[in-house]
Amino acid sequence: MAPITSFIRWAGGKSWLVPYVAQLTEGLDYNNYYEPFMGGASIFFSLDLPNKGCLSDINDELINAFCAVRDNPERVIRYLKEYETDEESYYVIRATEPKGKYQRAARFLYLNANSFNGLYRVNRNGKYNVPYGHKNATVNYTRLLEAGKKLEGMEIVCHDFSDISTKIVAGDLIFLDPPYTVSKEDTGFVGYNSTWFSLDDQHRLAKLIDQIKKAGAYYIMTNAAHETILEIFKDKGRMVTLERNSLIGGKKAYRGKVPEYIFTNIPERSTK
């Protein structure tokens, strides 16, 4: 299926990286696709995949929403149409905890569309706590239906990133977009699931890359442009530095150009 745009907003999303990945993978003969830090899955949606693969994340609400959109996007839309988008309704819906698969997905997508900056964040008790942000914001139903078709046949699961190691075979393509952690003191808090992504996890990720390379598969990884990251991954493949616009944040002072490292073992001949 032709490339499309993700149906959700996501902090740290990689839509800005789509042109580079398209250039990097042009002419590359790869098999199944894996994205174990799925988020909004912008890279997955941008690719014209030759086969299938697996999308995964540790956020169970995110995974439930993607599964619901894959399995029956029309049903998700029916529940979404029941919601009002004013501020009072937002806080009422935010306080609810629906149990059904499709009701949960609709609430997730509604909050994503109407929350401040499109954040999905919970506190340590697992309660969603992002304030209202958008008046009359709506979910793009056409994009939702397109995503449902694109997701058909994809495995979508909630698990740790390292769990894909037993599935990877030669010729597969893995896109890695971990939370950015650069020191033991500056441990990355993954606010959307109340867990930490530690420096030790960065080392576990380095071991996964070793397994990917040993299997004869390809990988692309984004990470923080920091000397600690360079030290951990310096022998894992070639590295380039790209700049992105920082769009998520409550203070304008924190918005601007931000460098990121891109590591890959895709042969340079595959790029133009």
Could you say what each language-model-derived stretch is?
Residues 267-272:
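Flexible, glycine-/basic-rich loop-and-beta segments that form/coincide
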Residues 110, 262-265:
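Short, well-ordered beta-strand micro-motif
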Residues 38-42, 143, 224-227:
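Short, polar loop motifs at secondary-structure junctions
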Residues 170-176, 180-262:
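Conserved acidic-Pro-Pro-aromatic motif
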Residues 29-85:
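Conserved S-adenosyl-L-methionine
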